Amino acid sequence: MSKAEYPVTQAVCFLRSKKIDFVPYVYAYEEHGGTARFAECAGKPEHQVIKTIVLQDEHKKGLVVLMHGDKHISTRNLARELGLKHIEPATADQAAKWTGYLVGGTSPFGMKTALPVYVEESIWALDEIFINGGKRGFIVGMKPENLRTLNPQDVHVAVDA
C-alpha cells in the first residue's frame, strides 16, 4: 500500500517521529463492528487485534488499557492492581476530549493528552499486533515491542468475552 493510500493521522505522525515500522490497513468501518470486523476483513486472528479502551478512575482521571480483541477487561481486577476503588469506561465525549480521537478510531499513539497506558501482559507474547491507527477503518500492524514507546505498565486483567 503506498503512502498516499492511507490517512496521515496523529498516530501516524507519532509512529513516523519514533521511526516505528508499521503496515497500514484500511477497511470498511462498520458501527459496532469492533475488532471482529477488522479481523474478518483482513483475515487476521481477533486475538491479535488490540483494542484501545479509554477508562476513568473514581477521581475522573483517564487511563488507557490495551486489550486483545477477543477479551474483555475486568475493571474490578484492574482497580485492584492499580490500588484504586473504582474504574469505569469513559464516556465517548470524554474519551474524545482526552485522546483527540473518535470512539472506534482511538489509537494509543499521538493522543491529545498523555494518559497512563496499561497493556494486558499476554500481548507481549504475540508475533504481530494490529491496533487502531487513529481513524475509524484504519489499523496499523506492527511488532508488540513498539508499544514500549508509550511507557506502558503491564496488567493481567483479561477475561473471556
Regions from the language model: what does each represent?
Residues 1-161:
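Extended, low-hydrophobicity, polar/charged segments
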